[in-house]
Amino acid sequence: MIQLSKCIQMNEVNSEYEALFSVIHPILYGLVMSLKQDIVSQIGGYKNMSLGMFTRMYVPGDGDCGICFEYAVHNAIISKNSDVLNRIDDALTKYCKIKGTDPSSILFGAEKSGQVQFIDSVMEHLTDDSLLLTGKKGQPIKLKKHINGVAAAFRKPKEREKLPSSINGLWKADLFVGNTLQDKWVGTTVKINPSQLESARGLRLGIVPSRQGKSDKITQHETKNLIICPVPYDYSFMEIFYEGWDIVKQFINAKSEMPKEINLPGSLDRTVCKHLVDRKNYNVLDVIEYLKSMAQPHLLDVANESANIDSTVTDKKISVNRIVAPISSLMY
């Protein structure tokens, strides 16, 4: 069980300055709440924790929080957002030999920057007959049979050698997208930046945000064996989230001091970060409330909920216990 913060876009980004405060406060709150509670109790609770103290207590990977664009795509599919579903259905039907009117998604890589690969109820969604289609000649792979090996391969390169050669890159998948009635699926990679799409054996579908002024045509990449499927998304909204994430991370890495310019070179980013530096001696929850007051009004609606995400990895505790998922208004 992990905590999920859905940051749902309600309006367009009007002011980058105010928008950064809008996204920083749920990110910072998520990181603060991800601290181990026994450590928080030792100082008498959050009421005794300053922002600067938090940066010294925080250990990356020791109860962490991640931004997850993959979840935004996954959520749009399972919530049956018609604009997104139509795009996915076209890609599956025309290019992946998976016909049907009700595409579905299984979230596989909930947080790739953590130390553990998560499986989101994979065993509930897959059957013993679930087939993985790779776009290559040969018999389809029975996915459930190999799912534990794929998860292990994410963490241990040596485990990749144990996978069938046709899917030895499947550990790079973010989602499995397909049709539950046909019980056919494709390994799917999700990237905010299309140039970061990479081929790997076992991957078939590449989902990227559509961009204004660019073609949103579904295409088959000539060399990567990937079907590229742009989906509606407010690109500027996503950029703001990653920019805000970087500001918070650099501030933490600098232990509440102003980060070196090489680490945070943008003038606007440094201006926003200075608000954090100037308040390092104030209570961390009070600082978060201050950040809310500086935010663009009505840009975000933050909904917190618990999510069942099961890990197939048994030799290590889950290191990521909270996900911040930016969800564009075009996807909701």
Predicted features, each with a name:
Residues 167-169, 176-188:
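Active-site beta-strand-loop-beta-strand hairpin of nuclease catalytic cores
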Residues 92-95, 171, 185, 245:
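A residue-identity detector for tryptophan
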Residues 2-4, 10, 82, 86, ...:
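Hydrophobic transmembrane signal anchors and adjacent membrane-proximal interface regions, especially
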Residues 79-169:
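A short acidic/basic microdomain associated with nuclease active sites
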Residues 154, 162-170, 190-277:
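Catalytic cores of nucleic-acid endonucleases
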Residues 47-50, 97-105, 198-202:
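A short, polar/proline- and glycine-enriched secondary-structure boundary/capping micro-motif
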